[in-house]
Amino acid sequence: MKRLLLLRHAKSSWDDPGLPDHERPLAPRGHRAAERMAEYLRSNAPAVDLVLCSSALRTRETLERMTDAFGGAEIAVEDELYGATDDELLERLRRVAMGSETVALIGHNPGIQDL
């Protein structure tokens, strides 16, 4: 059975309103939340074969906090996932190799929520 884990990036910071959206980091609360989610995944989630992650800083920082939970999964950081709609995310998932049983997708709302 194929499995998909949909993850929105953890809480981002709005401390510097001059930063481009793509470069917004996680807030301290977001770092803590991502670490808690990693603990949860280690205990409860199936082994992940592939992680697809948006190239935005906050999604990459979320991934960094969760990397251990994904074990030896292949990791792909992709520009096309930043700002992707649900249809675009679905199209990207259709291109995943058949050998991947469990895929984690770290992205943004509204795309993740709508998917």
Can you say where each PLM-predicted feature lies in the sequence?
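Active-site-proximal alpha-helix that buttresses catalytic centers in soluble enzyme cores
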Residues: R3, L7-D79
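A short, structured active-site edge motif that brings together acidic residues
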Residues: A73-E88, R94
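Short beta->alpha junction loops/turns
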Residues: A56, Y82, H108-N109
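Active-site micro-motifs of SAM-dependent methyltransferase domains
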Residues: S12, G83, I112
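Active-site-adjacent alpha-helix immediately C-terminal to a catalytic or transition-state-stabilizing loop
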Residues: R60, L93-L115
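A generic local structural motif
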Residues: A38-Y40, L90-L93
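A structure-centric signal for secondary-structure junctions around beta-strands
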Residues: M1-K2, S100
